[in-house]
Amino acid sequence: MATKVQGKHAAEKENDDGLREKMIAVNRVSKVVKGGRTMSFAALSVVGDGDGRIGMGKGKAREVPVSVQKAMEQARRGMFKVALKNGTLHHTVVGKHGASTVLISPAAEGTGVIAGGPMRAIFEVMGVRNVVAKSLGSSNPYNLVRATLNGLRASLTPAEVAAKRGKSVEEILG
C-alpha cells in the first residue's frame, strides 16, 4: 500500500465559507474479488476555520476527486471548537488513538508550529501559531490525526478547570 502523505507543503484551500481545507493522505486501496481487483481511493482531510474550530474526515470512492470531496464534507460535519490562548493551547495535553500517542505543548510567541506531518496540517488549519508537538509510537497518518484530535478535545480552559474543582480562576492560575 502506497500512502501519499503531504506534510509541510500540503495543498491548502480556503473556501468561500471561510474554512481552510487540507488534504493529509490519499491511499489507493484494492478489494480482491472473483473477477480480479477492484481499486478505490481513501482520502483523509482536515478542515478548520483558523480560529480554533477543527474537523477530520475520511472518504472512500472509485476516483480520487470524489473521495476527497467526501472527506471534506465529513470533516465539515464533524467540526468542534478548541479554546486557544494567544494562538496556542492553555496547557500540555496527551492524545492517544490505537498505537499512536501525541504530546502537544503550548509555546511562547515566535516559536512557530513545531510538529511533524499530519499534526502540522491540523494546527495550521486550526489557527494555532505557536505549538510544540511530538508523535510517539505509530506514524500512521489516520491514527496520528485521531490522536491529535483526541488530545485537543481533552484540553480545558482555566475556567473549566476552576468549575470542576469548585474554585475561582484566580486560585487555579495561582
Swiss-Prot record:
Keywords: Ribonucleoprotein, Ribosomal protein, RNA-binding, rRNA-binding. GO terms for biological process: translation. InterPro entries: Ribosomal_Su5_D2-typ_SF, Ribosomal_uS5, Ribosomal_uS5_bac-type, Ribosomal_uS5_C, Ribosomal_uS5_N, Ribosomal_uS5_N_CS, Ribsml_uS5_D2-typ_fold_subgr. One of its GO terms (cellular component) is small ribosomal subunit. GO terms for molecular function: rRNA binding; structural constituent of ribosome. The keyword Amino-acid biosynthesis does not apply. Residues 19-82 form the S5 DRBM domain. The N-terminal domain interacts with the head of the 30S subunit; the C-terminal domain interacts with the body and contacts protein S4. The interaction surface between S4 and S5 is involved in control of translational fidelity. With S4 and S12 plays an important role in translational accuracy. Located at the back of the 30S subunit body where it stabilizes the conformation of the head with respect to the body. This is Small ribosomal subunit protein uS5. The gene is rpsE.
